[in-house]
């Protein structure tokens, strides 16, 4: 089940990331055509974007000239400013592999008490799962504005509620079917 879930998560991540890349390419093609066929209209869009950011007069004209003189920068600016797309793209396969690896790494931790045939395996598994949720949340704080403690407890609470619901549904279905 762990492997199947890992593959499922990796496939979902791959498809989601691939969709982002496809969307980026689609809008890039649109902007390239606009620049080729209606450059003045696109130049005016650049001007409007930077006017809205507070530039005026000579500074505005200079920024517009600098950006539109460099086709790659012009397209990149349009993609970021007009469509809100990121400056860099993730690689779908790489993202999927990271997801799969992380899922396996953290997903195996709750199984340790069963593999080691520990007394009270279920309780130990719950304990290890809680620690794992907290650690994942703490690591997540690296990309967040929240403290490691806050992120750790946030993930612990959400993970515990989710795991409890899943366990409860499984228990209910087990009793329903037996």
Can you annotate each of these PLM segments?
Residues 1-16:
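Internal alpha-helical transmembrane segments
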Residues 11, 50, 60, 103, ...:
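Residue-level signature of catalytic and energy-coupling elements of molecular machines
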Residues 17-99:
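Cytosol/matrix-facing amphipathic helices and coiled-coil assembly/linker segments
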Residues 109-114, 139-141:
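Generic transmembrane alpha-helix signature in multi-pass membrane proteins
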Residues 119-131:
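Structural signature of hydrophobic alpha-helical transmembrane segments
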Residues 167-178:
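Juxtamembrane boundary at the C-terminal end of a transmembrane helix
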């Amino acid at each position: 089940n762990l492997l199947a879930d890992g593959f499922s998560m990796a496939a979902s991540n791959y498809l989601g990331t691939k969709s982002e890349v496809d969307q980026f390419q689609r809008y890039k093609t649109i902007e390239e055509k606009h620049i080729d066929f209606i450059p003045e209209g696109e130049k005016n869009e650049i001007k409007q974007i930077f006017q809205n950011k507070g530039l005026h007069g000579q500074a505005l004209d200079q920024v517009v000239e600098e950006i539109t003189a460099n086709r790659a920068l012009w397209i990149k600016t349009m993609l970021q400013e007009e469509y809100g797309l990121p400056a860099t793209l993730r690689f779908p396969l790489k993202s999927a592999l990271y997801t799969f690896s992380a899922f396996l790494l953290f997903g195996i931790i709750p199984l340790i008490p069963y593999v080691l045939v520990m007394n009270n395996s279920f309780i130990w598994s719950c304990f290890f799962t809680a620690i794992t949720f907290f650690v994942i949340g703490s690591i997540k704080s690296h990309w967040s504005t929240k403290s490691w403690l806050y992120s750790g407890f946030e993930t612990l609470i959400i993970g515990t509620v989710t795991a409890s619901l899943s366990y409860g549904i499984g228990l209910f279905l087990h009793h329903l079917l037996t």
